[in-house]
């Protein structure tokens, strides 16, 4: 249901049904709020991290991109349901971001270090801080990520938010380009110091912590297989982006430790990928290629500063024009780029749902991931019974207690 301040003022929350507005109608309500923000906020704020007109434009672009593909259910979402008017809105609002003071940070690794909080890459982020710097007793910590440090590296490292083998495989390259069709044919992973024919997109080493490699670039904190809590269940990989370097220490002054890493809502690259997506669906493939190659060039430039130890294992190239001669191939490039660039940043499922390919992608993932082996250790057996049902699982069901509490008020979501 749509519940705003009027519902609270009128004490009418328990009288509001969940089918009062359509999918498009609900988006319209959200868009109206962001349009108000867009019209009244300044383009620049004096303090880093404060919301501004450009952040509102990014939100508007994301709303229109969500609407442009359909209503979220697979049968009525995807390439056969494109709304070009909404796609043009995406271009209009991302144009505001593209022509602002925001830009790509020069090195991909810097994006996820505390020293670069509120940089030109950060269009909007949830702000966190260190108690030693913010004049508070304990610090305004990022509790959402406190459990994601790898096991044995942090006092709060409980090894949550684990990358999959499928994701690691997706970073494979051949002649510098993604292996679209056969990336997942066999399990592969790099080992520090071992160079072979298989090369990798450099962003792998900024995104996924792996045994034998320095943890977040620091050789004195090299990961081993002992840094995984339950490898026979969840494997040996760990997520790197959302945690600081170990030498920086934990930054919450209390019995439980947490981090002062900001939580990105929009970074510049994310918005530019949204822009490229809209360009492809509007037939402007050359403009999309330019954006995607700019992002890949930044990745290519992000080896020497932080991951020189993996230099011989990295290979990345720009897309030639031949990859952007038709929408189908261009889409494949865009979607792959979005997966690699935004990996472990929490938006993957919503990308798949928006494109109308969640069921095929996730069910194939479940089938392959249950066969994982790392150095003789099998894991991920919990995927054996996993299944995603199209035109049902795109949205959660209305909880039974809500249906029971106010009989007849709510309509259960489709196929539950």
Model regions and ranges:
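Acidic/polar-rich alpha-helix caps and helix-coil junctions
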Residues: 1-142, 152, 175-416
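Residue-level signal for threonine
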Residues: 52, 161-170, 399
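Nucleotide-sugar donor phosphate/pyrophosphate-binding loop at the beta->alpha transition
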Residues: 145-147
